[in-house]
């Protein structure tokens, strides 16, 4: 059409239906716009109709609002609603007033990890309805003064909020270039203008295929500069406010200062509201762009983490949700996590737990879960008092799972296990265990309980009342290996709790069978092996439940998995403390089977240590001592292992050989000879390999060396050796090895090797001061953690 053919444009607006907004407190007015181009004679030449809608938000609507007055005001101010529809508007407002915000179930279903879109704000809410055909007019407004630029950007934003318009806007390079230029040049002039333009680009950022456009105009870098500037401005506002508050506090009678402070405070509140709208939309845009890790790295290099952690000091829930969501995304990379550590993030997050806002609390807990993989941050969480706060959340169904995961990570550290005893955590966990209706307990719950049961104080709380009885009943009913692992941890602690297991020895022994699931059998065996109770008649247990054939059968190389075989060896070590049991086992031919296993597993220190511990137990008893010394090659193996690089193995060997030497003179000579040879090996090698000349033979004083080497039997010089127990020298000095260093294990102070004894005698007449059970592979193997891990969330 030629320009002269059209004289003017006729626009007609026709009102339509009115309805309530599905989620907000707002009315939706449907209307139709009809545009007609008239010719020179006034006749219509071209016409177009478009259906539109206007949203009237009713922020002030609450339970006490006068509906009649509000309806009248809405009809008066909105020209799209005919006065005849006043009663209809009133009914809709009444419905909105009484409508519940959302159903709890629905809200839970719709909950997303992504924050909500920024709401409408002052500057974008204008009465004018934008039209995609009027884009040229809106672009022209961007070249005018600030108020016109704000208006033009608001109209373009109105269009951009409708995803259907984005493709068309993308083709309008003039508009996008003008918006980017105005933002770059004028963002300091008007917060509303900056917010509008960033919001327009945010609409594009919601779709990954538009990210190239935002990168092209360098909007991301500009947003980071704006955020940094606004955060610094906020600090200046706070400083100014703080100075005026201090002046008022120092001169309470001065009303002028009070009025000045009140005025400044109101101004500050208004500025903060606008600033937080800007921060929210800018950060959301960056969060969308950060889905590309290369872009995220650029943000990290521009200190995005520091900016976000600073923003945690705000009180605006919606802004905080966005900030914490961003931090959660960033926290999966170590560099970002380290930046958060520098900014003391845990101290800032602790104030949000608990909080009234459900979404904020949920996302904060998820950020803490990510951070809790770091040992130092777990330590910080305990220091700032998060333990009782997280424990309190276990009772809330919405947060129970995520809070438990964080607590589980904290429970991995031995230092913190005992602290759980001073919260109400354990009673809550026990309640959850017994209320769990599924055949298998939640992995997170049982893993957490397994860790806590490694501490003696916690175990006392677990066993209170019928705690152990209920656990045993459930574990045996469901054949649950993880629940039995928890029971096994309970059984390892000396004291009253160990004696509670006397009632369940039969139940546990009945599970030791090849017909049961191997994992479950391992845990039952491990629990029985922990029951070093003097009054327990192990011979009766072995005979009644026919355990000896099972134990012997599993010792054959390749007969079972290594984990099960190791538990069998440990079990044999426990029952061998009993004289009659040791004899029973010796008669069954278990000792040769152990030696064969020792040959097969000689590279595995754990196996070696536990097998020689069985020998150590057996040499205490006359019946088994003779078998070991006279009928097997066990002493020879022990001599070979005397100088093993593993300290634990050396210790058990030395003590076992000392007992053998005490009862057998022939072996005593061999043992002493080997000890002497090893102790003096370097010196002897030097002497035998060199011919000392005249100048060297007096290096060692006046005493001649020859008598020690050539004259007489070397074994006739007992002053050169340790005595039979290997600890006391001929001068009566005590070897330093006699003393154990103490350390912290599972939150309890224990001996260096987890088996300190007193110098008294045990129930079988054995001196406890020499040796106790070596640390077992259960929970302490170097190749696997003692706690149960679960999948990352």
Curated annotation (Swiss-Prot):
PROSITE patterns: ARM_REPEAT. GO terms for cellular component: axoneme; centrosome; ciliary basal body; condensed nuclear chromosome; cytosol; dendrite cytoplasm; endoplasmic reticulum; glutamatergic synapse. ARM repeats lie at residues 333-373, 374-412, 494-533, 578-620, 621-662. SMART domains: ARM, KAP. The modification Phosphoserine is found at residue 60. Pfam families: KAP (PF05804). One of its GO terms (biological process) is microtubule-based process. Gene3D superfamilies: Leucine-rich Repeat Variant. Residues 103-119 have a biased composition (Basic and acidic residues). Keywords: Phosphoprotein, Repeat. Phosphorylated on tyrosine residues by SRC in vitro; this reduces the binding affinity of the protein for RAP1GDS1. Residues 103-123 are annotated as: Disordered. One of its GO terms (molecular function) is kinesin binding. Involved in tethering the chromosomes to the spindle pole and in chromosome movement. Binds to the tail domain of the KIF3A/KIF3B heterodimer to form a heterotrimeric KIF3 complex and may regulate the membrane binding of this complex. Interacts with SMC3 subunit of the cohesin complex. Heterotrimer of KIFAP3, KIF3A and KIF3B. Interacts with RAP1GDS1/SMG GDS. This is Kinesin-associated protein 3. It comes from Mus musculus (Mouse). The gene is Kifap3.
């Amino acid at each position: 059409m030629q320009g002269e053919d059209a004289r003017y444009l006729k626009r007609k607006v026709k009102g339509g239906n009115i309805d309530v907004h599905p989620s907000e407190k707002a009315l939706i007015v449907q209307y139709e716009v009809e545009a007609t181009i008239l010719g020179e004679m006034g006749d219509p030449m071209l016409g177009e109709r478009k259906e539109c809608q206007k949203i009237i938000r009713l922020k002030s609507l609450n339970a006490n609002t006068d509906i009649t007055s509000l309806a009248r005001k809405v009809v008066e101010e909105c020209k799209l609603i005919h006065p005849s529809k006043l009663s209809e508007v009133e009914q809709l407002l009444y419905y909105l007033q009484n409508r519940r915000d959302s159903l709890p179930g629905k809200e839970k279903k719709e909950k997303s990890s992504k924050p909500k879109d920024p709401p409408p704000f002052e500057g974008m809410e204008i009465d004018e309805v934008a039209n995609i055909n009027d884009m040229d007019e809106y672009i022209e407004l961007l070249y005018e003064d600030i108020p016109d630029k704000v208006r033009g950007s608001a109209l373009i934003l109105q269009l951009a909020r409708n995803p259907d318009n984005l493709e068309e806007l993308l083709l309008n390079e003039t508009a996008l270039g003008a918006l980017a230029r105005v933002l770059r040049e004028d963002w300091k002039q008007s917060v509303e203008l900056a917010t509008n333009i960033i919001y327009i680009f945010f609409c594009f950022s919601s779709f990954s295929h538009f990210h190239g456009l935002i990168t092209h105009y360098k909007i991301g870098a500009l947003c980071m500069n704006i955020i940094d500037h606004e955060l610094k401005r906020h600090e200046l506002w706070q400083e100014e406010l703080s100075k005026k508050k201090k002046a008022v506090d120092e001169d309470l009678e001065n009303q002028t200062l009070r009025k000045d402070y009140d005025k400044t405070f109101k101004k500050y509140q208004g500025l903060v509201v606008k600033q937080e709208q800007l921060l929210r939309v800018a950060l959301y845009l960056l969060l969308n762009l950060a889905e590309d890790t290369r872009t995220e790295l650029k943000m990290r290099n521009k200190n995005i983490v520091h900016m976000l952690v600073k923003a945690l000091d705000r009180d605006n829930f919606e802004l905080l949700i966005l900030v914490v969501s961003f931090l959660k995304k960033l926290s999966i990379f170590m560099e970002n996590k380290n930046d958060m550590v520098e900014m003391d993030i845990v101290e800032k997050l602790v104030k949000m737990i608990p909080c009234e806002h459900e979404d904020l609390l949920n996302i904060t807990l998820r950020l803490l879960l990510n951070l809790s993989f770091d040992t130092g941050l777990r330590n910080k969480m305990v220091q700032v008092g998060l333990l009782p706060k997280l424990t309190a959340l276990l009772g809330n169904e919405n947060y129970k799972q995520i809070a438990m995961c964080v607590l589980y990570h904290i429970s991995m550290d031995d230092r913190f296990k005992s602290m759980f005893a001073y919260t109400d955590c354990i009673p809550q966990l026990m309640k959850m265990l017994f209320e769990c209706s599924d055949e298998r307990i939640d992995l997170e719950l049982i893993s957490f309980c397994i860790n806590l049961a490694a501490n003696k104080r916690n175990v006392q709380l677990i066993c209170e009342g019928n705690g152990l009885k209920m656990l045993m009943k459930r574990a045996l009913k469901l054949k649950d290996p993880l629940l039995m692992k928890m029971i096994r941890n309970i059984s390892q602690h000396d004291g009253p709790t160990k004696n509670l297991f006397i009632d369940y020895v039969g139940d546990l022994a009945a599970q030791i069978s090849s017909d049961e699931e191997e994992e479950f059998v391992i845990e039952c065996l491990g629990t029985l092996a922990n029951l070093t109770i003097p009054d327990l008649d192990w011979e009766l247990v072995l005979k009644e439940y026919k355990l000896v054939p099972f134990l012997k059968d599993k010792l054959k190389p390749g007969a079972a998995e290594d984990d099960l075989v190791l538990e069998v060896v440990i079990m044999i070590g426990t029952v061998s403390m009993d004289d009659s049991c040791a004899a029973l086992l010796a008669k069954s031919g278990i000792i040769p089977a152990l030696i064969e296993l020792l040959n097969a597993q000689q590279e595995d220190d754990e196996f070696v240590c536990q097998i020689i511990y069985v020998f150590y137990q057996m040499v205490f008893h006359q019946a088994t001592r003779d078998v070991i010394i006279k009928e097997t090659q066990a002493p020879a193996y022990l001599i070979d292992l005397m100088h093993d690089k593993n300290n634990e193995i050396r210790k058990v060997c030395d003590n076992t050989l000392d007992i053998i030497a005490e009862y057998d003179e022939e072996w005593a000579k061999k043992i002493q000879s080997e000890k002497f040879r090893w102790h003096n090996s370097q010196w002897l090698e030097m002497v035998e390999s060199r011919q000392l000349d005249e100048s060297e033979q007096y290096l060692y004083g006046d005493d001649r060396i020859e008598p020690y080497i050539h004259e007489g039997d070397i074994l006739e010089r007992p002053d050169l050796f340790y005595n039979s127990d290997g600890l006391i020298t001929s001068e009566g000095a005590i070897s330093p090895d006699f003393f154990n260093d103490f350390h912290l294990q599972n939150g309890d102070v224990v001996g260096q090797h987890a088996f300190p004894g007193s110098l008294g005698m045990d129930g079988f007449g054995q001196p406890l001061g020499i040796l106790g059970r070596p640390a077992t592979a259960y929970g302490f193997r170097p190749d696997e953690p003692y706690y149960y891990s679960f999948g990352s969330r």
